[in-house]
A protein has these predicted regions:
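Sec/Tat signal peptide C-region and signal peptidase I cleavage site
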Residues: 19-24
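Short loop/turn motifs that connect adjacent beta-strands in outer-membrane beta-barrel proteins
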Residues: 25-26, 39-46, 88-98, 136-143, ...
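Surface-exposed strand-loop-strand hairpins of Gram-negative outer-membrane beta-barrel proteins
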Residues: 26-27, 56-79, 113-120
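Outer membrane beta-barrel transmembrane domains
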Residues: 29, 62, 68, 203-318
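Residues on the lipid-exposed face of transmembrane beta-strands in outer-membrane beta-barrel proteins
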Residues: 39, 51, 82-88, 129-136, ...
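Transmembrane beta-barrel strands of outer-membrane/channel proteins
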Residues: 49-57, 99-107, 145-151, 191-197, ...
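Residues that define the transmembrane beta-barrel architecture of outer-membrane proteins
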Residues: 74-80, 118-128, 165-171, 206-214, ...
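Long, hydrophobic/aromatic-enriched structural stretches that serve as scaffold segments
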Residues: 75-137
Length: 318
């Protein structure tokens, strides 16, 4: 999973510009905007391969009061996530067992023309592993819970402006829920959550504070033919992400990391999906502009991609 590690360079520049101490604040590892509709639905039994592309761009940085800091610049990244789900036929506690791994590649850049400041990096980023997922399919609800961790496999060096990784481990408690609001299950309410706990950052005395993310969506399904072989899904989605505990340790200049203001960011947007159940195919597009941020960049997130499931062959009864 890719993360906002490149914000460090932007904050380091603002340290010089705004004379504000300790602005090299870490952001959450989980990039919001990846979930939305169908948040509680696990893939069918078998192997599911997905490709998800994220583009985030921002030209505004907000202070602890949500006001714009008067510096002209741009911050953005592209990330390509190659995702594999494995869902065996095994049942645990009456629910489906699943596992997931994400293998990401990222490219990011930060530019502040006034000061001739440019930074960025490209390469393999941090790896997301979700070894345990348990999901249940009820009459009007699909839900799952999982444990995941973020491994610091991306390139990282303290105070470098070309980092692709975050330089620390993350442990995550994750969940997803889809509620069917109508009998025909065409109208849904969705919620995904992620609670992050971080280790100390490599080569420093800093421990980023814990973060909590929710992603939500309200969706409607529309058949595109009488046989229901092609389905269009449209909905309103959004995300909210907060830092929930103070940063730990000290920065390289001796300033306590706990003095850094807590960050948060909030967005609302739209999602469209094309589902082809007979071919086990799904394609999706999401657009979420951020409308509020504190101690964080404010911009917009675009996500698009697709998935395909290879189902296990059915065993014929003799």
């Amino acid at each position: 999973m890719v993360r906002h590690s490149f914000v460090i360079a932007f904050f380091a520049c603002l340290l010089l510009v705004c004379l504000a101490p300790a602005r090299a604040q870490q952001q959450a590892q989980w990039i919001p905007g990846q979930d939305g509709l169908n948040a509680g639905i696990l893939p069918d039994q078998g192997l599911t391969m997905a490709n998800l592309t994220i583009n985030y761009s921002a030209d505004s940085l907000k202070n602890a009061k949500g006001k714009s800091i008067p510096v002209v610049g741009t911050f953005g990244f592209w990330a390509i996530e190659n995702i594999v789900y494995y869902v065996p036929k095994t049942k645990i506690l009456g629910g489906e067992f699943a596992a997931q791994v994400m293998l990401p590649v990222a490219n990011a850049s930060v530019t502040v023309p006034r000061f001739g400041f440019n930074a960025g990096g490209t390469g393999y980023a941090d790896t997301w592993v979700q070894p345990v997922m348990l999901g249940w399919s009820l009459k009007r609800v699909n839900t799952w819970v999982a444990y995941a961790f973020m491994a610091p496999t991306g390139r990282f060096a303290p105070r470098s402006s070309t980092n692709v990784g975050c330089g620390y481990w993350g442990n995550d408690i994750v969940s997803g829920t889809t509620v069917y609001l109508t009998k025909n299950k065409k109208t849904t309410a969705n919620l995904a959550t992620d609670w992050e706990i971080h280790s100390k950052k490599q080569g420093t005395n800093e421990t980023p504070g814990q973060a909590f993310t929710i992603e939500w969506g309200l969706g409607q399904l529309f058949p595109l033919d009488k046989k229901m072989t092609k389905l269009l899904q449209l909905g309103v989605i959004g995300y909210d992400q907060w830092q929930v505990t103070a940063d730990g340790g000290t920065y390289s200049n001796g300033i306590p990391a706990s003095l850094t203001p807590f960050y948060s960011v909030h967005a609302i947007g739209v999602q469209s999906d094309l589902l082809v159940p007979t071919e086990n195919l799904e394609f999706f597009f999401k657009f979420e502009p951020e409308y509020l941020a504190y101690s964080h960049t404010q911009g917009r997130t675009i996500v698009f991609g697709g998935s395909w499931t290879w189902g296990f062959p059915k065993v014929r009864k003799p």
